[in-house]
Amino acid sequence: DINASNYGLTFGFHSRIDDRVQRVVSKIDVGNLYINRNQIGAVVGSQPFGGNGLSGTGPKAGGPRYLQRFAMQNLLPLGQLVPPRLTLKEVSNALNINPKFQLPATVDLPGPTGESNRYILSPRRRVLCMGPGSKEYAERAKLLGCNAVAVTLCTNALILVEELDAVICVGPAATEIRKALSARNGPIVPVLMDENFEMWLMREQSVCIDTTAAGGNAALLAS
């Protein structure tokens, strides 16, 4: 079982059967997946690169989340947070704008004729929320499709939790939680310490398919 190895950088697969291809894409846990392609290697601008599990913990290089990883949020003390004065029209407009964060999505990326490149976001499934605000964070994580649970747990007990994809803890306890998780075997579990954690609860996957290898592609006739 490839997924059981906990390594998931790249995976190549050849098949002319579309149903089989879709089944593999939906089940394999790797960062970059190549279908019917004669080489396994990411192309800048088409396939953001990075793995899952023991093959990587950060955002994909060349992906939309890459620069965010080098930034740190600077929160103001609560006493300095002064709400702006808005007119009723401004309030109405603010309530009706599109949200900045969308639910799991698939984005088509550019590539040569005869090649499909998709960037896929999917939720991390098993998420523990600890510390102050944990109940609120769990509810927010559930909206993304995560199986999130708010718990009060001794940090040393985290090593006993067998399946875990992420821990949310905004507060001083996060450092101890990170140390405890480092003693676990298997994939590195990220500790999310920023209140704007939604994007970090999403897994990234790049899927590249050579559409010409399946016996023809009608889309090529119009290109």
Residue locations for each model-derived region?
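Conserved C-terminal structural/oligomerization subdomain of aldehyde/semialdehyde dehydrogenase
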Residues: 1-223
